[in-house]
Amino acid sequence: QIIDNTDGVPIGNYLSQYFANLMLAYFDHWIKEEKRVRYYFRYADDMVFLASTKEELHILLSDIKKYLAALKLTLKGNEQIFPIAENRADKHGRGLDFVGFVFYHNQTLMRKSIKQNFCRMAARLNKKLNISARDYKQKLCSWYGWAKVSNSKHLLKTIIKSQFYDTFVLRCKAV
């Protein structure tokens, strides 16, 4: 099925990443050098701006919309301005969900959907009686990568088969 559409950039196309960086390179410079935004992060077309007050962010959002309009680009319309919580228990804000993680001031967690997929795969593998340690490690190493850079040590110890845990962690560190 061919969809004739001229809006946006094709998702999943290798050129999409290149075009996103090409189109937004000057935007990055404008944000950092001219607008002097201290905390700005971008992955392809996902952007995060951090500031001391909501007012600063509302002004910045207005300026960004004007800048992008000059390039004939628009924001998706799902932008959000909110306080970031100290940790998961803090009810005076929320975590920042970005690139597969949920960031708080003092902790980083895996996104819930990634954690659920990790747990499901580990449970499926833990039920197999005749799985080799090598196959077990190969199936779970990518999720281990997510877990090791977040605050998920307890999760790892809980879901990985105890007989594989020590060698699993060593093997994944070597990969």
Located regions from the model:
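Conserved polymerase palm-domain catalytic core
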Residues: 1-44, 48-65, 71, 78, ...
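Right-hand nucleic-acid polymerase module
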Residues: 4-6, 58-59, 77, 81-175
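Juxtamembrane/interface motifs at transmembrane-helix termini
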Residues: 70-71, 158
